[in-house]
């Protein structure tokens, strides 16, 4: 009986010491669909979810940019930093070949050449980013 107790205790301790990296992004973590892209002044619409199918996926320190209407089905991955109300894209890679690309290559996804976004709104359901390229509104799905 004592050996069963020790075995159960060892199993419990092993289960509690998993090696998974913990998420540090809070509400930012997840899949985001672009619903509206407006100019920086807000006077005209550049794209909506009806004209473009742009998605951002956030996990750990990776940001994935994807346009589902792009027939080539390529996407880009980038490392990013999230601090308070700022999101900064640092290094970007083109998939499927993992080529390093300049940040201005991400302009079609709404990413500015300097990679810096201001987070205007962030909840578990909505995200609003602004930059010199415009204001991007997303919904979580």
Feature-to-residue mapping (PLM):
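An amphipathic, hydrophobic-aromatic interaction surface with interspersed Lys/Arg
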Residues: 52
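C-terminal motif of bacterial Sec signal peptides marking the signal peptidase cleavage site
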Residues: 14-18
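N-terminal helix-cap/turn-to-beta initiation motif at the start of protein domains
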Residues: 19-33
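Contiguous, well-ordered beta-strand patches that form the walls/edges
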Residues: 38-43, 49, 59-124
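Sec-dependent N-terminal signal peptides
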Residues: 4-13
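Short, low-complexity, Pro/Ser/Thr/Gly-rich segments in the mature regions of secreted, periplasmic
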Residues: 130-141
């Amino acid at each position: 009986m004592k050996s069963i107790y020790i075995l159960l205790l060892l199993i419990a301790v092993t289960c509690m010491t998993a090696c998974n990296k913990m998420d540090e992004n809070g509400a930012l973590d997840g899949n985001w669909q672009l619903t509206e892209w407006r100019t920086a002044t807000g006077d005209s619409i550049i794209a909506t979810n009806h004209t473009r199918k742009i998605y951002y996926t956030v996990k750990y320190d990776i940001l994935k940019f994807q346009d589902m209407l792009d027939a080539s089905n390529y996407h880009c991955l980038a490392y990013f930093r999230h601090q308070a109300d700022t999101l900064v894209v640092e290094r970007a890679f083109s998939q499927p070949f993992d080529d390093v690309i300049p940040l201005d290559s991400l302009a079609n996804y709404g990413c500015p050449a300097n990679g810096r976004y201001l987070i205007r709104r962030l909840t578990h359901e909505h995200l609003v980013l602004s930059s010199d390229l415009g204001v991007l509104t997303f919904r979580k799905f």
